[in-house]
């Protein structure tokens, strides 16, 4: 029997998703918990790997098992053995043809950024941070150059193992959540607010979103014009782009599957993001 799980996690304490000899990864913790519940070794395959410090709202994994249990028994039983910063949100039996990675038609990420003269405190590690005001129109114009199919070599980490740097970005949305009028505590021309950058594409390269974010923020701060984004893209060189941005505010929102699989499309964790 093949099972699919939706998993959410705070990535601050882990060395990314993928299993490592240290054992301090989300995959290692999940498989250990599944093994204890199932009393047998369980190997999972995920929809998309995340780096150290990156969070997951709805990672999807699949695995094969001989254990017959109700779907919610998998949820409660596995969560019993998981640390508090990792939780299985749902479980569902799927056909043997389902593959969490190969069946995904797209993947979604969000980056949450705090704009404030004061560094984050209660949300430290869960948001990125800038202390300069950002130009929304400039950032919006800049990301238009990235939509569609392109060679994203300029935004690719040197350790990336992808066979091709050509990917397709379907959507990049930028939204700003500001405090109510009259309640701003901004200083030095920087009004505190949260920015949310949402990305949807067929697939992503290693560090691709964090490298794009570095360029978006540089343009938002006025260091470069919006057209610089196209210059960086066409250079096809990592040296042409801005430094890699912090992993703190990056969230893997999850994969997108066809309706024929009947899998959940979101979890409650989506609703608390700014």
From Swiss-Prot:
Reported EC number(s) for this entry are 5.4.99.12
Example GO molecular function term?
Answer: tRNA pseudouridine(38-40) synthase activity
Which residues bind substrate per the record? 109
Active-site residues, record numbering mapped to chain: 51
| UniProtKB keywords | Isomerase, tRNA processing
State the superkingdom.
Bacteria
InterPro entries, per database record: PsdUridine_synth_cat_dom_sf, PsdUridine_synth_TruA, PsdUridine_synth_TruA_a/b_dom, PsdUridine_synth_TruA_C, TruA/RsuA/RluB/E/F_N
Q: Which reaction does it catalyse?
A: uridine(38/39/40) in tRNA = pseudouridine(38/39/40) in tRNA
**Gene Ontology terms describing biological process:** tRNA pseudouridine synthesis
Statement: the UniProt record of this protein carries the keyword Flavoprotein: no
Keyword Signal in the entry? The reply is: no
Give one Pfam hit by family name.
Answer: PseudoU_synth_1
Q: Can you tell me which family this protein belongs to?
A: Belongs to the tRNA pseudouridine synthase TruA family.
What is known about what this protein does? Formation of pseudouridine at positions 38, 39 and 40 in the anticodon stem and loop of transfer RNAs.
Q: How does it assemble?
A: Homodimer.
Name of the protein in its database record: tRNA pseudouridine synthase A
Gene name for this UniProt entry = truA
